[in-house]
Amino acid sequence: MKYLILAALVAVTAGLVIPLVPKTQEAITEYVNSKQSLWKAEIPKDITIEQVKKRLMRTEFVAPHTPDVEVVKHDINEDTIPATFDARTQWPNCMSINNIRDQSDCGSCWAFAAAEAASDRFCIASNGAVNTLLSAEDVLSCCSNCGYGCEGGYPINAWKYLVKSGFCTGGSYEAQFGCKPYSLAPCGETVGNVTWPSCPDDGYDTPACVNKCTNKNYNVAYTADKHFGSTAYAVGKKVSQIQAEIIAHGPVEAAFTVYEDFYQYKTGVYVHTTGQELGGHAIRILGWGTDNGTPYWLVANSWNVNWGENGYFRIIRGTNECGIEHAVVGGVPKV
């Protein structure tokens, strides 16, 4: 029965994909909301489509796993996998799991998702003893084999960097937490009572690599602050393998192709409905569930809390929507 439901979903969602029809953002909103009922589209107030393009990476970084990448295999009885799972409630004392960050106008999503999921995993593996935020900027600026910084990077290489060089601590620009907080300010949006200045016309450049703590109020040396991984790997493409990995070790990093309509996601279970391809994006999968019979992944984005469902989104599960199930990576921390 489960496979019949998935087959039906594939057929339905395939019928929805009619790219390049609407010519304006307003037309995309109307088209999405009139053609399907799984999710609601709404033009965001605080982020433009041009800003979103700067926050994405080239689609080459979303490619499925290559043969040289180790793929972890879980021996699991699929009948034992729960119908719903949410890392936020499974590990409520891990401060990173509930944290939504802001990558600003830089295609640093690959570094953010790695730092976020690694932060979660250190807390989980240590039973809360290592409860911190790891620095997206450390891997963004200092991993020379990861890719091109603000132009994008390979998620698996960020996890390999965690094994080889480690991540120091560091939170958001606003919080100035840890050794190396993010140095690129939010821009063009109002968050709470703070309105940030307009974004740079061409987006941000990749910050320079600095092998020291940039937070002057942090009293731990850069090398002593490093947190290391023991392994880095890809996760099998089957839904049950991704679920088993999250249950065993915590949230994973995944990459997918972004289309114009995703920019307008407001609520519901996203399925690509229309619009041009914009680029690739990396995110953190926290769990899964169903909404009126539609299976979904629960995902944390890095576009601040004003976007989507308070910074989160749900995307249809079991159909490899936009490639999201074929580019999942993770690793085990040293604790």
Curated annotation (Swiss-Prot):
Cysteine pairs bridged by disulfides in the record: C94-C123, C106-C150, C142-C209, C143-C146, C179-C213, C187-C199
User: What induces this one?
Assistant: Induced by ultraviolet and ionizing radiation through a cep-1-dependent mechanism.
Indicate whether Repeat appears among the record's keywords. no
Coiled coil residues, start to end:
none
Q: Which residues form the propeptide?
A: 16-80
Q: Which residues are glycosylated?
A: N193
Pfam families in UniProt: Peptidase_C1
- Cite a single GO BP annotation: cellular response to UV
Single GO cellular component term: extracellular region
Q: What is the effect of changing N301A?
A: No effect on protease or RIBE activity
Q: Which residues form the signal peptide?
A: 1-15
Q: Where is the active site?
A: C109, H281, N301
Q: Which GO terms describe its molecular function?
A: cysteine-type endopeptidase activity
Sum up the protein's function in the record's words.
Thiol protease which shows activity against the fluorogenic substrate z-Arg-Arg-AMC.
Q: What is this protein called?
A: Cathepsin B-like cysteine proteinase 4
Species: Caenorhabditis elegans
